[in-house]
Amino acid sequence: MQHAWLEQALELTDVSWWPVLRHGLAAVVAADADYLERLAQDDYLPTNGRIFTAFAQPLDAVRYVLVGEGPYPREQSATGVCFMDGAVDALWSSSGLSKQVNRATSLRNFMKMLMVADGLLTPESTTGEVVADVAQRAQAPEAHFIQTLPELQNNLHANGFLLLNAALVFRPHVPPPKEAKAWRPFLEVVLEALADRAGQAPPTLVLWGKIAALLQAMPVTTQFPQAVAEHPYNLSFIKNKDMQQLFGPMRLLAAKNLQ
């Protein structure tokens, strides 16, 4: 691989991924010889070489592959890790979820889905005073709830999540479906590597949104258990029973995750 900027980006990943990621980048070039060169000369998110940050999760630790659509379209928010908004720290406030969480619509709905899954909210009542009541309980010292988004990310990692996007970059002048199409060969290589791990069953593929669901066209995805849902941007995600059943046993809002 001749792109020095991509080699530098690999330094933020776990070394177990390096051969896979290099192979994946070669697949991108094979499909579109000039794509990476054009990208290198353009402005894109995430910045500071964080394009592969999700791959800090070691290859052999992956039990779930969660795929969203693309990075947040804001520099502070785009981290290279699916749905982990860099502009968010505190999860709670005195009146409910924090202002930062409420501004990040997908994250807000994911949090509410987790609260429903944990029995803290009912599907019919997920706004206003009931959320404020949960927030007050969550912030009590004896409650043992996570308090920050990095803690939520740590709990997801502890449960074996690889948090990817269908498109690894965001550019305002490139439609997200087109950007995602360019990265499909890369993701296919990643999934093949996960399917081929010796002595390990393929992880569960969790696809959120229409762009992520397009990965189902890849033959390799037939080897994976799958959980497919609408994008969390949609309010209906909060009531998605399949997602509640998937995430409920993980107790992701617990400060001491024992999974």
Segments (PLM) and residue ranges:
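Low-complexity, highly charged intrinsically disordered N-terminal segments
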Residues: 1-13
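A polyanion-binding, active-site-adjacent surface
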Residues: 12-199, 213-214
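Proline-rich intrinsically disordered, low-complexity coils
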Residues: 19, 71, 175-176, 202-203, ...
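Broad hydrophobic/π-residue packing in well-ordered secondary structure
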Residues: 71-72, 81-83, 205-210, 219, ...
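C-terminal folded domains that constitute the principal catalytic or ligand-binding module
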Residues: 166, 191, 200-204, 208-216, ...
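Short conserved micro-motifs at the rims of enzyme active sites and ligand-binding pockets
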Residues: 174-176, 217-218, 238-241
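Amphipathic, Lys/Arg-enriched alpha-helical patches that create a basic surface
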Residues: 190-194, 201-206, 248-259
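Short, flexible loop segments at boundaries between secondary-structure elements
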Residues: 221-254
